[in-house]
């Protein structure tokens, strides 16, 4: 029993000795003379024959590490407290350029023997892009940084900082020391001279002190940098101590001359007289390359910068845009010109869909969404381009109707006006009506298109928040989607006015053959002038003929409204239908009704024309069209159709008296038609 007790006591005493030895670990290197079995060298780190630990050489963008191979028990496993520690060392930095170096040196306490994934340059071999600043690093370091890195908040290119898990220092100061008169003296880290450092951590006050001084000076009374922080959350139980360094683009060498360390006590003083001397540094002689080559390179660089600036300015002008106050509310629908330029492949002629008096239209594919669009680029010679463009933006930007061509957005640059529409794959209606088209529309398709356009025009007149006068209803402005549904487009001539107010338009704008007589006289556009144009459109779709045709051979002018009206007077109105429709397979009564409705909408008296609400009722069969009956036409009454010889003063029998039940009065339309707006 006594023997067992003696063995237990001996084992306990041995453990205490080992713990005490670990808790008071210390070592001193007055130079690093090979072989160094207890120091691990990594990266560029080597030992010179005279005992200098050379962390880096003149290689660029490299790291060098030197760590003591013995693990040090920094933290008490029972209470979690970090032990006090102290270290002192002497280092020097040699640079090929006296005023510039890269990138510095750091004393490190790390959880691993080396830092294999650390980066060079501004990361000083401590961290990389992904782990910089992570709490899981468990790295304490004091950096002696010779390059200012703004991303880490460095104050300058000659500073000392305390780093905890990252390169954004917890505290820092310009490198220097306070002399015996308490006056701060700057100290250049790249002076090519030996510099001595003291780093102390007190586990009771949790104070970290970093003191710096020239090689041959005593330790200053005041530290350069201090910081209070309990390192128990930073350091693990077992850690390694050592140094890290890194190079950047400037050729630099980092030397460690001597080093001592102690746990739970003050680090032993270095024997300065025994420390190895630095290699003699001689400045390089300026070669012929620097005398001749550098000026040539500089000159080439200047020309390159000028060319680059010219290219940037030219490119900026190429995609330059304009933005005015009125565009603010439509900002979300604004396209960049660069995007439209690439979408249309530079507005190539092969992507040109059409060209008119108001502008040219190009097919394009938006790079981001791959959406097919039609980009209308307004011609430079458009006299009222800006006004028309603004009207279009305001009227279409917020509209949403299945029979209107959606306006996706717009762009403006240096006087150019661009509108971006949803692309309609089947193009405009007119190409299916004239010039022997390859594809002929049957009556069902034409009827669907007519009803769709009527619905869209009714939306503009009565269903939207403001009255919108289209002013250019015609077959070429009706676009067909993939299912041959008619969509009313080209709002470049649209005008808005509030419900109940007079339209303030004074310019005669539109297309010959679709202009109402009163529009030619007064220059004012109203919903009734749109109805007149829609009447011409109805006759156009049913007959397959243009509202006006000039025959140069006979010097005659064909007026579609006049022709259909004359056929109706003779009782042969069905002769006006398009021969391509054939004679069967569709509702002939519906065709006749549409022709008569076209005449009614083309009435010379705007009060006699139906509203678009009534037009829809007729087309949908919700209300019967009033019967048209010829009366005595010998009274000589005439109507101005706005069709021939400048569309003023065309004599034509006035059929305002041929409708059954016509009595005249303040509202002719109300006496003729039921319903209303």
Swiss-Prot record:
Superkingdom, taxonomy of origin: Eukaryota
Secretion signal span: 1-22
GO molecular function: ATP binding; carbohydrate binding; protein serine kinase activity; protein serine/threonine kinase activity
Glycosylation sites: 26, 57, 81, 128, 134, 171, 186, 203
Localization in the cell: Cell membrane
Catalytic residues of the enzyme: 472
Positions in the Extracellular compartment: 23-291
GO CC entries: cytosol; plasma membrane
Catalysed transformations (reactions): L-seryl-[protein] + ATP = O-phospho-L-seryl-[protein] + ADP + H(+); L-threonyl-[protein] + ATP = O-phospho-L-threonyl-[protein] + ADP + H(+)
Protein's GO biological process: defense response to bacterium; pollen development
Keywords: ATP-binding, Cell membrane, Developmental protein, Glycoprotein, Kinase, Lectin, Membrane, Nucleotide-binding, Plant defense, Receptor, Serine/threonine-protein kinase, Signal, Transferase, Transmembrane, Transmembrane helix
Positions in the Cytoplasmic compartment: 313-677
Entry-linked PROSITE patterns: PROTEIN_KINASE_ATP, PROTEIN_KINASE_DOM, PROTEIN_KINASE_ST
Traits of the deletion mutant: Male sterility due to defects in pollen development leading to deformed and collapsed nonviable pollen grains. Increased susceptibility to the bacteria Pseudomonas syringae, characterized by stronger necrotic symptoms.
Record domain Protein kinase: where: 347-625
Pfam families for this protein: Lectin_legB, Pkinase
Main location (coarse class): membrane
PANTHER family: PTHR27007
Family according to the record: In the C-terminal section; belongs to the protein kinase superfamily. Ser/Thr protein kinase family. In the N-terminal section; belongs to the leguminous lectin family.
UniProt protein name: L-type lectin-domain containing receptor kinase IV.2
Gene of this entry: LECRK42
């Amino acid at each position: 029993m006594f023997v067992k007790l003696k063995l237990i006591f001996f084992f306990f005493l041995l453990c205490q000795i080992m713990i005490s030895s670990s808790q008071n670990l210390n070592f001193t290197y007055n130079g690093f003379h090979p072989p160094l079995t207890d120091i691990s060298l990594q990266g560029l780190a080597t030992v010179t024959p005279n005992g200098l630990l050379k962390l880096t050489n003149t290689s660029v963008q490299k790291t060098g590490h030197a760590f003591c191979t013995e693990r040090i028990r920094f933290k008490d496993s029972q209470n979690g407290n970090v032990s006090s520690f102290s270290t002192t060392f002497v280092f020097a930095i040699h640079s090929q350029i006296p005023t510039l170096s890269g990138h510095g040196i750091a004393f490190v306490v790390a959880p691993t023997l080396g830092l294999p994934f650390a980066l060079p340059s501004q990361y000083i071999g401590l961290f990389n892009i992904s782990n910089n600043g992570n709490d899981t690093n468990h790295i304490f370091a004091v950096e002696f940084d010779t390059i200012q890195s703004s991303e880490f908040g460095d104050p300058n290119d000659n500073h000392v900082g305390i780093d905890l898990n990252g390169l954004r220092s917890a505290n820092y100061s310009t490198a220097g020391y306070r002399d015996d008169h308490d006056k701060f003296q700057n100290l250049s880290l790249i002076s090519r001279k030996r510099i001595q450092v003291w780093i102390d951590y007190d586990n009771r006050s949790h104070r970290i002190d970093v003191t710096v001084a020239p090689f041959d000076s005593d330790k200053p009374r005041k530290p350069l940098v201090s910081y209070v922080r309990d390192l128990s959350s930073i350091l693990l139980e077992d850690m390694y101590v050592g140094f890290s360094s890194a190079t950047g683009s400037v050729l630099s060498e980092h030397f460690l001359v001597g080093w001592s360390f102690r746990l739970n006590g003050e680090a032993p003083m270095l024997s300065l007289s025994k420390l190895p001397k630095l290699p003699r540094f001689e400045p390089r002689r300026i070669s012929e390359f620097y005398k001749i080559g550098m000026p040539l390179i500089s000159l080439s660089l200047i020309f390159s910068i000028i060319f680059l600036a010219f290219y940037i300015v030219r490119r900026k002008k190429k995609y330059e845009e304009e933005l005015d106050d009125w565009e603010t509310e439509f900002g979300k629908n604004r396209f960049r010109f660069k995007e439209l330029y690439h979408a249309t492949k530079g507005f190539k002629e092969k992507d040109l869909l059409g060209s008119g008096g108001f502008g040219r239209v190009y097919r394009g594919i938006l790079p981001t969404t791959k959406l097919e669009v039609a980009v209308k680029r307004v011609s430079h010679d458009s006299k009222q381009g800006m006004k028309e463009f603004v009207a279009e933006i305001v009227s279409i930007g917020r509209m949403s109707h299945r029979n209107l061509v959606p306006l996706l957005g717009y762009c403006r640059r240096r006087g150019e006006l661009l509108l971006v529409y949803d692309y309609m794959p089947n193009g405009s209606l007119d190409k299916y009506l004239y010039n022997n088209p390859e594809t002929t529309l049957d009556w069902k398709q034409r009827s669907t298109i007519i009803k769709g356009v009527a619905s869209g025009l009714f939306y503009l007149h009565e269903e939207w928040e403001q009255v919108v006068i289209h002013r250019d209803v015609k077959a070429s402005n009706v676009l067909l989607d993939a299912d041959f549904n008619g969509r009313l487009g080209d709002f470049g001539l649209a005008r808005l006015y509030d419900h109940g107010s007079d339209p303030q338009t004074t310019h005669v704008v539109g297309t010959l053959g679709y202009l109402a007589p009163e529009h030619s006289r007064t220059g004012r556009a109203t919903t009734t002038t749109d109805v007149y144009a829609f009447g011409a459109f109805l006759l156009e779709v049913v007959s397959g003929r243009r509202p006006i045709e000039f025959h140069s051979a006979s010097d005659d002018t064909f007026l579609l409204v006049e022709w259909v009206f004359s056929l109706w007077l003779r009782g042969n109105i069905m002769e006006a239908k398009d021969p391509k429709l054939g004679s069967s397979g569709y509702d002939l009564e519906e065709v006749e009704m549409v022709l008569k409705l076209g005449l009614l909408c083309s009435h010379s008296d705007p009060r006699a024309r139906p509203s678009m609400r009534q037009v829809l009722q007729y087309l949908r069969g919700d209300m019967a069209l009033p019967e048209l009956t010829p009366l005595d036409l010998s009274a000589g009454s005439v109507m101005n159709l706005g069709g021939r010889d400048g569309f003023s003063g065309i004599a034509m029998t006035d059929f305002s008296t041929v409708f059954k039940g016509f009595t005249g009065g303040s509202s002719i339309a109300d006496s003729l038609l039921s319903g209303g707006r």
